[in-house]
């Protein structure tokens, strides 16, 4: 199995700040590039030379840009799948409120699943587009969800459990198999109850074939049907 590597620049910046008092040779020798390893993923960080020479205002700007990226990430989660945000909330709440044996196979499986979905921005692998297969049981998650505080209870637990554990439900975030309807068979949240021909016909009707610099249609938009009519 191939190992995917991911770079985390913001974490590197913090590491460099913490190592500012060391010599360059000590910093080079001591720097640990690996943040974490799980499943087929290796999370990396790297050095940011001269970060410590930035002005306070420049560092504050980087901080707020990072915060903006984190905040905007929820848009990507939602676009990647209809139930992604609700599933993330469920798994995070079970993880943080867990009061049992954190060395148990069930909990370790939950922790692995949490890392996978956090890395992929959803319940599908970022490269293969296949839905993650949990290595903890449906019964375990249902039991732990039932013990959450009232304000942490999911609205529709059974639906979330089905999406997580049923391999036939939303198996691919983006399906590119030849001969299949790529819209109906993909789990992303940009289309709902609509087919590939309907999507193509909708956008083809909007195109101005005489425009030498045409606009791009469908960016960050969602197509669905209302009263049998395709709407954006």
Where are these regions (language model features)?
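Bacterial signal peptide processing site
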Residues: 20-22
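N-terminal helix-rich structural modules
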Residues: 29-232
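C-terminal motif of bacterial Sec signal peptides marking the signal peptidase cleavage site
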Residues: 15-18
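Bacterial N-terminal signal peptides that target proteins for export
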Residues: 1-8
């Amino acid at each position: 199995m191939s190992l995917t590597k991911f770079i985390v620049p913001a974490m590197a910046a913090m590491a460099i700040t913490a190592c500012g008092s060391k010599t360059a040779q000590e910093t080079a020798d001591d720097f640990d590039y690996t943040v974490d390893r799980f499943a087929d993923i290796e999370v990396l960080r790297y050095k940011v030379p001269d970060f410590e020479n930035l002005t306070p205002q420049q560092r504050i700007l980087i901080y707020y840009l990072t915060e903006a990226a984190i905040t905007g990430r929820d848009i990507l989660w939602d676009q990647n799948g209809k139930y992604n945000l609700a599933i993330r909330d469920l798994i995070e709440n079970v993880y943080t409120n867990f009061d049992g044996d954190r060395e148990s196979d069930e909990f370790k499986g939950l922790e692995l699943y949490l890392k996978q979905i956090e890395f992929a921005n959803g319940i599908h692998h970022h490269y293969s587009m296949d839905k993650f297969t949990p290595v903890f049981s449906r019964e375990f998650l249902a039991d732990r969800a039932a013990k959450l505080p009232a304000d942490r209870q999911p609205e529709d637990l059974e639906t979330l459990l089905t999406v997580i554990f049923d391999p036939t439900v939303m198996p691919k975030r983006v399906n590119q198999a030849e001969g299949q309807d790529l819209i109906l068979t993909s789990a992303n949240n940009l289309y709902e109850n609509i087919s590939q021909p309907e999507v193509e016909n909708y956008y083809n009707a909007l195109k101005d074939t005489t425009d030498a610099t045409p606009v791009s249609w469908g960016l960050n938009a969602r197509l669905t049907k209302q009263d049998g009519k395709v709407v954006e």
